[in-house]
Amino acid sequence: MTQPVTVEVRTDPPYPVIIGTGLLDDLARVLDGRHKVAILHQPTLTQTAEVIRNHLADKGIDAHRIEIPDAEGGKELPVVGFIWEVLGRIGLGRKDAIVSLGGGAATDVAGFAAATWLRGVDIVHVPTTLLGMVDAAVGGKTGINTDAGKNLVGAFHQPAAVLIDLATLESLPRNEIVAGMAEIVKAGFIADPVILDMIEADPQAALDPTGQVLPELIRRAVVVKAEVVAADEKESQLREILNYGHTLAHAIERRERYQWRHGAAVSVGLVFAAELGRLAGRLDDATAERHRAILISLGLPVTYDADALPQLMEAMLGDKKTRAGVLRFVVLDGLGKPGRLEGPDPSLLAAAYAEVARS
């Protein structure tokens, strides 16, 4: 991808997702007119954040760096309190903005801080992980974790823009790229089967941050999410399809105290959801098996502890999709045909889990 590509997210108001390389000038353009900007970044991105700060300063913007903890450990209320304190100290006003720089967790917590500071200030997401690019940065869902579960405290707050700089992929560890692929695979199964065809044609090319396949996979995954979000911004119905595989995934993450990568948990969750659909008579055997084959080809896990189901069931009952104690899952009625399964029999859940159980 030699020229930047823009995907428009048609919410109200709409915003651009700009995909390309060397997007510092685009960031300055998006932030034009702001007097102050707070750059929220993870510790490993201090140097990058300083480059951004200096670039914005050259454009006459008073930019400040705020370092936040890495990964899910940063998605906690004390971290948000610290951010609020610094925003107050630097005097960030309603016509100013926040920039999030980092992975999915940084995007989530920065978005929540932006949604709550002065009842909402603009935020521009600059995701630096594959997961952040195709999932957390697009759609306006923000959140933090509590003892009650993952992302149960949050707000809908659409960004002013998202800048996906593909050059950052080249410095990512391979396992970060592998983990992010789970969300791309999800997009393929729920809406864009071409994604699956591209991965199956050459899984290693799909994982190559210097090649041409991964940028196109990112673009397609962003388009899927943008279209769903535009149709259902506040997750009243259609947007729930983006949670395909996530009910079990969030339960696994909670059981693992958020030490598992989100993408790894989603991978297991996708296979579980496929088996649940198959055993419920809604998904054909070949498509269910295709889940497992594609995920394995990318190096993602497809099994989890055999004895964990009771704990996972308890965690799933706390999922935000649950209604009056009734579990609700997103399943497929065919390739690209997501639907809902409500209140499945415990024996069906146990049978589906047996397909991902690791002894």
Swiss-Prot record:
Which cystines does this chain contain? Answer: none
Record: residues binding NAD(+): 70-75, 104-108, 128-129, 141, 150
Cofactor(s) needed for function = Co(2+); Zn(2+); NAD(+)
Which reaction(s) are listed as its catalytic activity?
Answer: 7-phospho-2-dehydro-3-deoxy-D-arabino-heptonate = 3-dehydroquinate + phosphate
One GO process term, biological-process aspect: amino acid biosynthetic process
Where does this protein hold Zn(2+)? Answer: E183, H246, H262
Cellular component per GO, a single term: cytoplasm
Listed GO molecular functions? 3-dehydroquinate synthase activity; metal ion binding; nucleotide binding
Q: What is its EC number?
A: 4.2.3.4
Q: What is its main location?
A: cytoplasm
Q: In which pathway does it act?
A: Metabolic intermediate biosynthesis; chorismate biosynthesis; chorismate from D-erythrose 4-phosphate and phosphoenolpyruvate: step 2/7
Keywords tagged on the record: Amino-acid biosynthesis, Aromatic amino acid biosynthesis, Cobalt, Cytoplasm, Lyase, Metal-binding, NAD, Nucleotide-binding, Zinc
Keyword Amino-acid biosynthesis among record annotations? yes
Task: Return the broad EC class.
Answer: lyase
**Localized where?**
Cytoplasm
Cofactor stoichiometry and binding remark:
Binds 1 divalent metal cation per subunit. Can use either Co(2+) or Zn(2+).
> Which Gene3D superfamilies did the record assign?
3.40.50.1970, Dehydroquinate synthase-like - alpha domain (1.20.1090.10)
Q: What does this protein do?
A: Catalyzes the conversion of 3-deoxy-D-arabino-heptulosonate 7-phosphate (DAHP) to dehydroquinate (DHQ).
Q: Which family does it belong to?
A: Belongs to the sugar phosphate cyclases superfamily. Dehydroquinate synthase family.
What NCBIfam families has UniProt attached to this entry? aroB
Protein name as it appears in the record: 3-dehydroquinate synthase
Say which species the protein is native to.
Mycolicibacterium vanbaalenii (strain DSM 7251 / JCM 13017 / BCRC 16820 / KCTC 9966 / NRRL B-24157 / PYR-1)
